Amino acid sequence: DWHVPMFYGGDGIYWVGQVQRSYGELSGSLGWPFYEVAGRYDPNYDLIYDIFVWFVGLFTKDTGTVFNLYVLVIPFANALAGYAVFRMVGLRRWLSFAFGLTFGLTPYVQQRMAGHMMLAACEFVPFSVLLCLWCAEDEQFNRPGRGFFKNKRNWLALAMAWGIANNGAAYYPYFTCFFLCVTALCLILRDRRWRAGASCVVTIAEIVAWMIPDFFPMVLGILNGQGSTLTNGVYRSPVGADIYSLRIS
């Protein structure tokens, strides 16, 4: 049944809450009206799929349909991202296709799908690795100076930093910054000068700069004494009851 969610449990139910609370009329399933409606102070650290759910919600308000579309898109988005990165580093099309498909269907994605679907959506991880490669191989990449904005890769890095900062609920941005720190350490040890790690520091700063606005709603909620979904957990068990009720109703 297309209207019945493919998976249950884990953070995937968060997206059910997004559809039912933020982007359409609330459903009449068993969970309503006994759970708390999401407030104005939700952190926006996973905007990639917030935007996806909002867009799909323009055409259908059926929870199961949106949920299933979310599940089906993840492997293809991961594979497409992998293909793009492999092409950018100079691999042939057929090799890029093969490696991208392998990345999109990796067991990790399948295992995380039913538990933490936001982590299965790891389409910006290849771009994290690409940024590390650019820092290591391109001496002009993300180097502070007058010609900073004349380098096309620097503009691409800004776009990638936004995607990384808004993907994986802050997990993947932190991992990316860690990878960049390791890259910076290797470059400093290789060249024996601190300036060798400058591009990594600039890239980390770009990711952090994009992440800061994502947490503004949460901070405002805490300052107002109302908390947020991150601090009071309003989504977890209530929406879990609601999504399970779809199987019954």
List the predicted regions and their residue ranges.
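A cytosolic-side transmembrane-helix exit/cap motif
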Residues: 118-119, 143-144, 196-199, 223
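Membrane-interface coil-to-helix junctions
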Residues: 1-78, 106-122, 241-249
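Membrane-interface helix-loop-helix junctions at transmembrane boundaries of multi-pass membrane enzymes
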Residues: 149, 190-201
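Periplasmic/ER-lumenal interhelical loops and adjacent helix-loop junctions
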Residues: 210-249
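Start-transfer (signal-anchor) and selected internal transmembrane alpha helices
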Residues: 1, 198-206
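Short, aromatic- and cysteine-enriched interfacial helices/patches
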Residues: 33-34, 58-59, 143-149, 194
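Membrane-embedded helix bundles of polyisoprenyl
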Residues: 70-89, 93-188, 207, 213
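Generic recognition of well-ordered alpha-helical segments
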Residues: 18-22, 131, 184, 218, ...
